[in-house]
UniProtKB/Swiss-Prot annotation:
It catalyses: N(2)-succinyl-L-arginine + 2 H2O + 2 H(+) = N(2)-succinyl-L-ornithine + 2 NH4(+) + CO2. It comes from the Bacteria. Gene3D superfamilies: Succinylarginine dihydrolase. Belongs to the succinylarginine dihydrolase family. It comes from Paraburkholderia phymatum (strain DSM 17167 / CIP 108236 / LMG 21445 / STM815) (Burkholderia phymatum). The gene is astB. GO terms for biological process: arginine catabolic process to glutamate; arginine catabolic process to succinate. Its EC number is 3.5.3.23. NCBIfam families: arg_catab_astB, PRK13281.1. The active site is at E174, H249, C370 (nucleophile). This is N-succinylarginine dihydrolase.
Amino acid sequence: MQATEANFDGLVGPTHNYAGLSFGNVASQNNDKSIANPKMAAKQGLRKMKQLADLGFKQGVLPPQERPSMRLLRELGFAGDEAGVIERVAKNAPELLAAASSASAMWTANAATVSPSADTHDGRVHFTPANLTSKLHRAIEHESTRRTLRAMFADPSRFVVHEALPGTPALGDEGAANHTRFCAEYGAKGVEFFVYGRSEYRRGPEPKRFPARQTFEASRAVAHRHGLADDATVYAQQTPDVIDAGVFHNDVIAVGNARTLFCHQLAFVDQKSVYDELRVKLAKLNGEFNVIEVPDAQVSVADAVSSYLFNSQLLLRGDGRQVLVVPQECRENSRVAAYLDELAASKAPIDDVLVFDLRESMKNGGGPACLRLRVVLNEAERAAVAPGVWIDDTLFTRLDDWIEKHYRDRLAPADLADPKLLNESRTALDELTQILGLGSLYDFQR
């Protein structure tokens, strides 16, 4: 059956700020306490969505989550009226207010792991929201993620949106940022590729400086839950040294799609064996596997992390060629820029590079790949998606006007203590659910 890959980008929320919450994420740490521009951040992301939609790629949008999360603050023991709660948290535990106010749900690569209907045991598209247990500000996302996905993918005969895995370090799950899929064509059965940083129960190498956020046990549980065949599933461990260098998710060191894996030379433990297993399993499904491996001598891990070369989108055009979508920072690093020029001029499957300014997201450690959740859909499944979330000229204009109306153009850490920010955010989100036609998604609407 004919199918295509759709990308659902997270719309940056009104409380976008820099609080340095993500240990192991170099950009997040380096920009702690910087001044953010939520309006610019949201418009940069929206422009990327629109340009890719204009090029013919299927492009949807995921709404922001409600922030600050009053539910979290009340669960942590702060009682009283909302303005009073925010005032007391800001005074006594500002780090908790920062966590409750984070707009990190914009990075929808961490929203869930998705398996298309061609791969699953029951012929439905399966979603497992990521529990994101490694960080407080992200561990509060999965309930809202599940609610949003169930509103967007509501037909139970075609879609299954599971609960997140249990929230324990043994099952730490970071979603699609550590997952990709290879296939001969989107509508055919493919090979699903899960990458983990450590195992809870198996002995093996682990990073020493920064935590490994994804466990083997979580990856395997998601594969089992989705009903994936063992002979079409591959697990690989991310190299501990690259995690210690700031590669906190696999999508900072590798990206794959269809028949191609684009990765750094040092991405995986026992890298050749990983390639061999992917090649053999894909060949059994009549697919040819191509690897574009970037030598460390040409682009170092440090360059990969600072430029986010691999936190790119690898998109398949209708003619079978592939396009790499990279952040502007790749052109500002001379070694990475030289490599990309060489790649585009070669006969590799990737023969075009698109560059986007996503500076506001990048300063928090999120490039093009972080901002999108990939969902392979056949024609009937695509028709069953909530119709108001697909980017076109009309929706782009409405969202651009909505951002202009509701978002601040400056947000400092101290501004999180302003109770008016909560009301501004709720007013914006209430209007957004009407624009997207998603009903009452948020706690304050219920």
